[in-house]
């Protein structure tokens, strides 16, 4: 069952990227990238991880715009993907990108310090 949830998640990721970029007309929803979709084993709940270009205020506005369009997005997913019941969708920010950038910065600092000591 886990394999099917992964396949549904990947398909939803592809479709959500298209829906958000082409169908959502809300001005609060700017440059959004769908980075991952985690679907529960029973295919009832989908958590969509997004990355937003902009400051914290723009990120919050984007999240509000997506929450407002959640019903429309869910109906579009239901039309595009054949499932018995379309999963409930929740949106969250993907913190892994910032975390990866921070690790990269720390590694560069360590590398610079190592070169100075030589």
From Swiss-Prot:
Protein's GO biological process: maturation of SSU-rRNA
Annotated Gene Ontology cellular component terms: cytosol
A Gene Ontology molecular function term of the record: ribosomal small subunit binding
Gene3D superfamilies assigned: 3.30.300.20
Keyword Lipid metabolism: no
Domain of life: Bacteria
Localisation per UniProt entry: Cytoplasm
Record keywords: Cytoplasm, Ribosome biogenesis
SUPFAM superfamilies in the record: Ribosome-binding factor A, RbfA
One of the Pfam families matching this protein, by short name: RBFA
InterPro entries named in the record: KH_dom-like_a/b, RbfA, RbfA_dom_sf, Ribosome-bd_factorA_CS
Subunit structure: Monomer. Binds 30S ribosomal subunits, but not 50S ribosomal subunits or 70S ribosomes.
Similarity comment: Belongs to the RbfA family.
HAMAP family named among the record's database cross-references: RbfA
Role according to the record: One of several proteins that assist in the late maturation steps of the functional core of the 30S ribosomal subunit. Associates with free 30S ribosomal subunits (but not with 30S subunits that are part of 70S ribosomes or polysomes). Required for efficient processing of 16S rRNA. May interact with the 5'-terminal helix region of 16S rRNA.
Protein name: Ribosome-binding factor A
Species this protein is from: Bacillus cytotoxicus (strain DSM 22905 / CIP 110041 / 391-98 / NVH 391-98)
